[in-house]
Structures are given as C-alpha cells and as structure tokens.
C-alpha cells in the first residue's frame, strides 16, 4: 500500500491510501483541489471517501469530488449526512473497499459521533489523537475523549497514526512544559524540529512512539500528575485527563 499525505489549508492533512493497482481511498477531504491534483499526478483511481466527523475542514471538498466522481461512495458518521456522506457507518462496522478491510471505531469527544478507521497498520483518526496530543472537546466530555484515546491506545505498537493536522511541534512544546525532564520527549522534539525545518510531515507516527511522547496517553505518570496538581489512582484518571486538556487549551 502507498500512503500519501496531502497538505491542505494551513495545517490539515488529507490522506490517500492506494494499492498496487492505483485504486485508492480518500480520507477527510477538506478541499478538493489538492486531492484532484494528487489523483492526477499519481494516476490514482478513487474507490471511496472516508469521513471521520462533520467539521468543514474535513468535509468541504466532498461535493466537488462527487461532481468529478459521481458514483463514489462516501462513508461517514450520521453527523456527516448533510455534508455529503452517502453511507452512514458507526463504531463496530467493518468495511471492505477494494480488497482492503477497515474497522470503524467510535471515538466521541472532539464531536459526539466522531469515528476512526483502522486498516492494519493504518489508523485514520481525524481530530481525536494527534502526535503528542489529542483533539479539543467541542461537543463531547472529558470522560468520552479519554475513553476514546484509551481505546486507540490498545491497538498494536506498529499502528501508524494518521492524524488530520500538523500540530506535532506545538504539542511537543506543551509536553516539554508538563514533563521538562523527560528525555524521550526532548529527543523527539529535536527530531521533529529537523523534519519540519525541511517541510517534511511529522506523520504518520507509530503508536509505540506515541505511548512515550504523548502526555495524554500518560495520565498515570506521577510526575505529570504533580505538575498539573491532580493526583489520581490508576483506575480513575479522567480527572487527570480533564485538567491536562484544560491546561493545554490555555497554554
């Protein structure tokens, strides 16, 4: 499989996953022009569009893409029904597109009906899990978002996190503020600074790395808890996550 990140807007990524026959799926096309350019350049044949949630920077290109490809199915949660989705899916569904299987995972938090698509090893998680961070809570609760990212954290180490935004450096800056002595975070920050200086994407990233450098996946860390002022037992970490997310919002 060939995974392509298509830059859009200021910091979005639209994902394109293609097989050897050049058949591809398009994930979260916030605008159509860069997608059409990538399809033309690579001579790819789109088989489906996958939507993770209803925000315009993820769905804005659907209508125009459907004008170019009238028969293309557009999968998405119910909240995307009026944003161009033609087939509604929900957590627990399984899709087969061009010989590639996708597991639909419900990940409420950023929005109430947000979903992710997992096709081993690729995880298209929209605005739920970012490299070194997680999405803002526009509709859901901290408990929902924490449960969602914990669910994603159970996937295999080799899972490739395909987030929808290039937020990694900003997230690592916050992570360094929370855990200034953490060597894994410090080292990774330097690596990503070098990548971004060359205008190269920081994504996808292996889940194995995220477990080390993403503070939202480390709510059980006692140093982190002391830093944010919320000490909590391992079986009750939502309060830690909630305060951590609030501090990131203010950072």
UniProtKB/Swiss-Prot annotation:
InterPro entries: Clx_II_MBL, Glyoxalase_II_hydrolase, HAGH_C, Hydroxyacylglutathione_Hdrlase, Metallo-B-lactamas, RibonucZ/Hydroxyglut_hydro. Belongs to the metallo-beta-lactamase superfamily. Glyoxalase II family. Gene3D superfamilies: Ribonuclease Z/Hydroxyacylglutathione hydrolase-like. Pfam families: HAGH_C, Lactamase_B. It comes from Yersinia enterocolitica serotype O:8 / biotype 1B (strain NCTC 13174 / 8081). Thiolesterase that catalyzes the hydrolysis of S-D-lactoyl-glutathione to form glutathione and D-lactic acid. Pathway: Secondary metabolite metabolism; methylglyoxal degradation; (R)-lactate from methylglyoxal: step 2/2. Binds 2 Zn(2+) ions per subunit. Its cofactor is Zn(2+). Zn(2+) 2 binds at residues 57-58, 127, 165. PANTHER family: HYDROXYACYLGLUTATHIONE HYDROLASE, HYDROXYACYLGLUTATHIONE HYDROLASE GLOB. One of its GO terms (biological process) is methylglyoxal catabolic process to D-lactate via S-lactoyl-glutathione. It catalyses: an S-(2-hydroxyacyl)glutathione + H2O = a 2-hydroxy carboxylate + glutathione + H(+). It comes from the Bacteria. One of its GO terms (molecular function) is hydroxyacylglutathione hydrolase activity. Keywords: Hydrolase, Metal-binding, Zinc. This is Hydroxyacylglutathione hydrolase.
């Amino acid at each position: 499989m060939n995974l392509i990140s298509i830059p859009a807007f200021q910091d979005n990524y639209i994902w394109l996953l293609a097989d050897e026959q050049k058949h591809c799926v398009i994930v979260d096309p916030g605008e159509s022009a860069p997608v059409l350019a990538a399809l033309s350049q690579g001579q790819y044949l789109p088989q489906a569009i996958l939507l993770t949630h209803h925000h315009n920077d993820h769905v804005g290109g659907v209508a125009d893409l459907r004008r170019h490809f009238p028969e293309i199915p557009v999968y998405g949660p119910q909240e995307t029904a009026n944003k161009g989705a033609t087939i509604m899916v929900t957590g627990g569904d399984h899709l087969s597109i061009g010989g590639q299987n996708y597991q639909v995972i419900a990940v409420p938090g950023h929005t109430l009906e947000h979903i992710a698509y997992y096709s081993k090893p690729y995880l298209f998680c929209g605005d739920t899990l970012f490299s070194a961070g997680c999405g803002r809570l526009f509709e859901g609760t901290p408990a929902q978002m924490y449960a969602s990212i914990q669910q994603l954290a159970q996937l295999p180490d080799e899972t490739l996190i395909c987030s929808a935004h290039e937020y990694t450096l900003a997230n690592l800056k916050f992570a360094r503020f929370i855990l200034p002595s953490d060597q894994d975070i410090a080292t990774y920050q330097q690596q990503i600074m070098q990548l971004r200086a060359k205008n190269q994407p920081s994504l996808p990233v292996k889940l194995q790395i995220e477990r080390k450098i993403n503070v939202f996946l480390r709510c059980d860390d006692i140093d982190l808890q002391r830093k944010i002022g919320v000490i909590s037992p391992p079986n009750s970490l939502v309060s830690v996550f909630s305060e951590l997310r609030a501090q990131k919002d203010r950072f």
